[in-house]
Amino acid sequence: MEPPGDWGPPPWRSTPKTDVLRLVLYLTFLGAPCYAPALPSCKEDEYPVGSECCPKCSPGYRVKEACGELTGTVCEPCPPGTYIAHLNGLSKCLQCQMCDPAMGLRASRNCSRTENAVCGCSPGHFCIVQDGDHCAACRAYATSSPGQRVQKGGTESQDTLCQNCPPGTFSPNGTLEECQHQTKCSWLVTKAGAGTSSSHWVWWFLSGSLVIVIVCSTVGLIICVKRRKPRGDVVKVIVSVQRKRQEAEGEATVIEALQAPPDVTTVAVEETIPSFTGRSPNH
């Protein structure tokens, strides 16, 4: 008896297939080690170019043209705004660090061909983002509020430290290092309330008003005196002129009297001689 024509080989019998062969080949090539061309071993002051070693450029210079069999490396200086700090085989120089004033930064060391710029904080700012040896961002110092004192001033790395004034003291604008003691003024006015650390007693207002009144009164008095003073001066001048005129007239009268010829009446004097002739002394 012959088996039916549609019967095939048993299912457990394996037949080679093309996909299996492809998988084996793929795994074989995948596991094979890959070999890359080895780079030449160059000295510390050289850099590899293909299979050759070329001399490096000095700090502040970049490679313009690599070396050849008969020529050395051609180097040229870094352009402004760029730098290279070490021996190198770079074809481009590095860009200098920019210190942005909008971030509160300033250059504490300017950039050169051999050194990068170092940024620090502008006056009144402290660093909030440190990046290596330079600062990347700064912030303005905090301002103490009225009623606070400056406990510790800000530095380039630390903000200003503020502290509230203790009871019985005050700070009007927050810029003082030590709070001021509140003044007792019971002789002038009763205290309206407990003094706060940022405001003083009410007597400041009253005493200030009193001072203003006194100053205004003094100024008004001075103005009145100055306005009246010219009239008094005029009277004094008139009196002085009259007095001088009278003195002058008196002196003129005296001079005229002295210079006028004397009013003398000449009287003839007759000399008489007593006659004793014919008379005796007894008569």
From Swiss-Prot:
Q: Where found, per UniProt?
A: Cell membrane
Post-translational modifications reported in the UniProt record? N-glycosylated.
Topology relative to the lipid bilayer, per the entry, is: Single-pass type I membrane protein
Signal peptide region: 1-38
Question: Which positions does the entry assign to TNFR-Cys repeats?
Answer: 42-75, 78-119, 121-162
Topological domain spans for side Extracellular = 39-202
GO cellular component terms, A-Z? external side of plasma membrane; plasma membrane
Q: Which SMART domains match?
A: TNFR
Membrane-spanning segments:
203-223
The protein's matches in InterPro entries, at most eight in alphabetical order, are given as:
TNFR/NGFR_Cys_rich_reg, TNFR_14, TNFRSF14/UL144_N
Listed as disulfide-bonded, the cysteine pairs are 42-53, 54-67, 57-75, 78-93, 96-111, 99-119, 121-138, 127-135
Query: Which loops or segments lie on the Cytoplasmic side of the membrane, by the record?
Result: 224-283
UniProt KW Cytoplasm keyword = no
Q: Name one GO molecular function term.
A: receptor ligand activity
> Impact of changing residue 61 to A on the protein?
Abolishes cis interactions with BTLA
Stated family = Belongs to the tumor necrosis factor receptor superfamily.
Q: How does it assemble?
A: Interacts with TRAF2, TRAF3 and TRAF5. Interacts (via CRD1/TNFR-Cys 1) with CD160; this interaction is direct. Interacts with LTA and TNFSF14. Interacts (via CRD1/TNFR-Cys 1) in cis and trans with BTLA; the cis interactions inhibits the trans interactions.
Record remark on domains: The cysteine rich domain I (CRD1/TNFR-Cys 1) is required for interaction with BY55 and BTLA.
Query: What is the name of this protein?
Result: Tumor necrosis factor receptor superfamily member 14
Q: What organism is listed for this UniProt entry?
A: Homo sapiens (Human)
